[in-house]
Amino acid sequence: YEVYNQQIIPDLAKNNIHILHVSKLDEKQYEFIRRYFNDELMPVLTPMADDASRPFPFISNNSLNIAVQLRRQIHPTSKPVAEEILEGDQEVHRPQIEPHDDRQEADIKFATVRVPEIYKRLVRLPGENNFILIDEIITEFLTALFPGYEILATASYRVMRDMDLDVAEEDTSDLLRAVKRQLREREHGRVMRLEVPASIDEWLKDQLIDNLHVSERSLYEVDGPVDLTFLKKLSGMVDGHDDLRYPPYKPYLNPALDMDHNIFSSIRQKDYLMQHPYDNFQAVVNFIHQAAIDPDVLAIKMTLYRVSGNSPIIKYLGMAAQQGK
């Protein structure tokens, strides 16, 4: 986060690329996010409360969420934020979350809102290369999700759960069924890491620690947005600035290992050492492909780890299995 705050953000700004906070938006940009919330986000958001009538909401692994501290309004005096309308040059209404020192514990509630993964984390704003985080948009208009309540504090957070599989092959007669059961159960594994912003309200932090059963050493307070993986997508969203981009890297494929050559003949003559990503993995795919269709190959034995759903390796292994290998 030191690199993010002291290098990445300033360097982006020098090149007129901005990740803006709500407080820095002009009227046109603010009206844009208001409409974006109403039209795109609000229909898919599901606020979940924690009270005596229901258990603490389940927080799935690696999901981004917004924790909310609420208090019921006795005399609501304003409409939900999302109903505000910008007309002409009228000043944009920007509701502020007011701190309260006289909080009554009986009236204070905890709620959480999951940030939908179907939308990009970065939202493009009007203006050249201006962006805002989707969780900032949701936070700005939370009052529309909780009518009749006052928002006292908010904070984005993310949990990482123990996703290890623990299957003892010698103790089960049906390994496939045991693995399937473990895959379902690991989604509810214990929380190994809780990430929150360093500015989080103490009450919210205590609620998360207590209800997620997290130890203090598993709590990570970060100086910036929770989950910086959105930066991976930024380069593809920025217009222009080709001078700032790395040239595309093309891995090397040895001609002796392509499909136009018999790879078995090539490796009889010499050994080939490949290092990914510098060497093209297609050489391995070609090798398995040729082994699958070569009638002199009796069996293929290999170790696979986390293959994709459309893996060509799986395709050719299936082809080999159909031929009795």
Where are these regions (language model features)?
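N-terminal localization/anchoring segments of enzymes in phospholipid and broader phosphate metabolism
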Residues: 1-325
